């Protein structure tokens, strides 16, 4: 009876010893992790890659690139000339064209225009999504007074 009860204990002890030997051995299951980490750290230093152009030449080339400012109403552009001709064909004169161009170019520069985009966006009581700011909501208003 004593031999049968000792057999599982010996098997368990042998299994534990085998597991310790596998895990703590010099190469273990996946090798010595510390040794591998140190080898990876001491790996060969990557050499500097060869490029076709010197760094100064590349910087000089890239520094010279400047994006041209886009001028919407540049009269030399063919599409602007076409818009201008269409505008005159619709019956507007050149002064009216200049006034409209100035209006659209300067539209957002003055922030105090009551009928501008700001109040249309923020004080629209009839908007489906509701007012953008609760403080600006006029309670009980069933019409949007900004449209008048």
Swiss-Prot record:
Lineage top rank: taxon: Eukaryota
Tissues/organs with expression: Expressed in the intermediate lobe of pituitary, glomerular layer of adrenal cortex, choroid plexus and atrioventricular node of the heart. Expressed in the brain with high expression in the choroid plexus and the epithelial lining of the central canal and expression in the gray matter of the spinal cord (at protein level).
GO cellular component: apical plasma membrane; dense core granule; extracellular space
Residue positions assigned to the propeptide: 32-70, 133-148
UniProt cross-references to InterPro entries, sorted A to Z: Augurin
Chief location category: secreted
Cell compartment(s), UniProt: Secreted; Cytoplasm; Apical cell membrane
Keywords: Cell membrane, Cleavage on pair of basic residues, Cytoplasm, Membrane, Secreted, Signal
Example of a GO biological process term: anaphase-promoting complex-dependent catabolic process
Signal peptide from the UniProt entry: 1-31
Known role: Probable hormone that may attenuate cell proliferation and induce senescence of oligodendrocyte and neural precursor cells in the central nervous system. ECRG4-induced senescence is characterized by G1 arrest, RB1 dephosphorylation and accelerated CCND1 and CCND3 proteasomal degradation.
Sequence similarity: Belongs to the augurin family.
Descriptive protein name: Augurin
UniProt organism field: Mus musculus
Gene this protein is translated from: Ecrg4
């Amino acid at each position: 009876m004593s031999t049968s009860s000792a057999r599982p204990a010996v098997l368990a002890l042998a299994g534990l010893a085998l597991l310790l030997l596998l895990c703590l051995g010099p190469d273990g299951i996946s090798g010595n992790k510390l040794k591998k980490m140190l080898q990876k750290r001491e790996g060969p230093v990557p050499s500097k890659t060869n490029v076709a152009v010197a760094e100064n030449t590349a910087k000089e080339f890239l520094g010279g690139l400047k994006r041209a400012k886009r001028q919407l109403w540049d009269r030399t552009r063919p599409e602007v000339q076409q818009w201008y001709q269409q505008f005159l064909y619709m019956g507007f004169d050149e002064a009216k064209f200049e006034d409209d161009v100035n209006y659209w170019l300067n539209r957002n520069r003055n922030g105090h225009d009551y009928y501008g985009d700001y109040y249309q966006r923020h004080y629209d009581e009839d908007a489906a999504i509701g007012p953008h700011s609760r403080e600006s909501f006029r309670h009980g208003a069933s019409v949007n007074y900004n449209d008048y």
